[in-house]
Amino acid sequence: RIKPNGDLNYSFPVELAELLKDSSVFAKLDLEVMKSFSSKYAFALYEEISRRIGLSYKMTEELDVQELRDLLGVEDGKLITHHNLRAKALEPALSEVNAITPYQVTIIPKKKGRKVISFLMGWSIKDVEGMKEAHAELQRPKIGRKDRLSGASSSVVES
């Protein structure tokens, strides 16, 4: 609201105010990137990597299975098997984060026998060429991104 003397008063909704309190994270998140995610798991991974990217002493982290599920925001009782977790949450999140953000993220499963016991997560900032590619993908429509990233061909059909 603008007062007669020219002062401008404004307020933030409570939810946004809570988010802004943690300005160290919010300042690192790019609104354009955040709006471009189609996966909630990609958004969660992007937020967590943004928190870690400035750590000069750490570029990898080992996570047990539950820690990775928590990091991605996978709800309890959902995506129970490793196959489902990988196919429905982890791979789409990695694909999207690596395609449209300035970060390069890898998450490698560590096994004991056939069982996955933990994950090694690594992150870095892309080089100039990688940044250009991410920016170019960010400018393209969301529709068809999944096919572009997987290498599947898609075409528009005239009716």
State what each model feature region is.
Residues 1-159:
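Charged, alpha-helix-forming regions
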